[in-house]
Amino acid sequence: MAINPITRNKIKDYLNSFIQQQLSVYSQRSLREFQDVDSYPSSLSKDGDLKPFHASLIPASIMRLNRFERSLSTGLGSTFEECTRLIALDHHAVALRNYDIQAALDQAQWAAIDQLISTIDRGLKHQTPSLNQMLEQIQSIPLTGILETHIVRADLYIQRHDGSELFFEIKSPKPSKGQCLEVMQRLLRIYTIKQQSAVPVKAFYAMAYNPWGISRASYRSSITKKYTDFSNAVVIGQEFWSLIGEPSTYTELLEIYHEVGLAKSAEITQKLLQ
C-alpha cells in the first residue's frame, strides 16, 4: 500500500476540512434569484456576479451548484500540494511546501535566464530548447563578477533518503502561456542555483492529473508543449504521483478523494439546494 492508514486518515481529515471551508465561504455569499425582468437587472452586486441571462434561463439550484464547483476547483490545487507533502513524508527523508532557495549568482546568469524566457515568449524558436540546452547556454556566458541575490520558491521540495533532491511546481494541467513561462523560469533558476550540487537534483512542472486520459501520449495542451520542455520538464498524473510515492499512489489517492466525496455528498447537496 503506497498510502499507509495513518496518512490516509490525515488526508481525509484535511479534505473534509477543505470542503467545510468551501461550504462556509459559499454560505456567506448570497445568490440572487431571477424573480422578474425588472428587479434582477436593477439590483446591485459588490462582487460583480450578476448574470441576468444565465439566471433567467437556469434554475437557481443549478446556478448555486455551478458557483460552488467553480470555487472548489479554484482551491483544489492547494489540496494536491498538501496531499503530496503528506504522502512524500512516508517515502522520503524531507518534504516541504513553499520551499525557498536563496542564492547569489552572477548578474549575467540571472539575465541569461530572463533572456531565454523572453526568447521562448516571443516565439523566436520553432520549438522550446531542452532544459539541458538552455542550462549549457547559461553556463557558457561570460561572467560580470557582480553577484545578485534572489529567492526562488518551489511548491514542493523533497529530499530523498540518498540525499538527492526533487523540486516541483504543481500547476494546472491546462496552463496559460504565462504560467508555462513562469514555471520554466523557476526551473532554470533552480537548476542554475544547484549546478554545483554534490547530489543529484531534478526539478519538474507537475500536473496532478491528465484531463485527456491516463497516458502521457493522450495529453493535448498545445500551449504546454510549445512553451515548456515538455519531454523533460513535465510530469503528469500517475508519473508524478509515482515520484512522490509508488506506482499505485495515484489510484489510492483518487480512492480517498472519492470516499470523502461520498461521505460529504449529502451535506453538500442539502446546503446547495436548500
From Swiss-Prot:
What are the GO BP annotations of this UniProt entry? Answer: DNA restriction-modification system
Keyword Kinase in annotation: no
The record's keywords, sorted A to Z, are: Endonuclease, Hydrolase, Nuclease, Restriction system
In terms of InterPro entries, this protein maps to:
Restrct_endonuc_II_TdeIII
Single GO MF descriptor: DNA binding
EC number(s) stated in the UniProt entry for this protein: 3.1.21.4
**Catalytic activity line of the entry:** Endonucleolytic cleavage of DNA to give specific double-stranded fragments with terminal 5'-phosphates
Task: State the family named in the UniProt similarity comment for this chain.
Answer: Belongs to the TdeIII type II restriction endonuclease family.
- Function noted in UniProt: This system is less active than isoschizomeric RM.HgiEI.
Q: What is this protein called?
A: Type II restriction enzyme HgiBI
Species the sequence originates in: Herpetosiphon aurantiacus (Herpetosiphon giganteus)
The lineage, from the top, is: Bacteria, Bacillati, Chloroflexota, Chloroflexia, Herpetosiphonales
